[in-house]
């Protein structure tokens, strides 16, 4: 907690040239797990006071006076994400910070020059449209992006959110484009090393389903036929989608980083895209 910002802030302070980069950070919402997050602002909410306090703290840690993008890490209300299906026990609106208050607070940060824009994350179609509606009603700054998972094993964003991205000009910042590393191809071989993330984080069970592994083998064959790595196939597909405005890559080595970056120069052929869609039609969203 906070260390990533501290590391980047230390690097920025030594390097300078702040205007040469696009810098983003997030404010956490309330935890729905068993670990709790009361240590974050005494219980993380999206109230005006907490948004201002969290942003000021991030700016201090990052050694900068503005953020290019400030995101709500996940909704304050209860929603489905990380593989959860079925939605029961909706929160009472009286127990939640009004989205209008959240929108107004973020607009205040924009007007103060502390952030240049703000975005949403792990959001639903209802949540995105409600944020945009509140902005339109009040004339406040609107959200510019949604950071949600999107990859060959989880194309659920296409069901309701892709149209919103295109029609409302609120682009997808696609995270987990390699599906927790599954689409890197590394986890095709057994046994898994105990330090590999898929073994360490057992709570992310949606990535260890038989259908997911079956789909990976099919996509690996498509990549081989196209003469590229499985990771490059997966990343190039995400980048090619018209509603995607940023593909959030990750790497644990310089070799992986080079492989991922090279995917930006790959254009998938019509035959390759057809093969991808044929697999998706048979094994749809095995890791939602």
Regions found by a protein language model. Name each.
Residues 18-21, 25, 65-69, 116-117, ...:
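Short acidic capping loops at alpha-helix termini that bridge into adjacent secondary structure
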Residues 60-83:
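Active-site groove signature of glycoside hydrolases
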Residues 37-52, 89-97:
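Active-site mouth loops of central-metabolism enzymes
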Residues 47-61, 99, 103, 128-132:
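Short, acidic/polar
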Residues 75-278:
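Beta/alpha (TIM)-barrel catalytic core signal, keyed to glycine-rich beta->alpha loops juxtaposed to Asp/Glu
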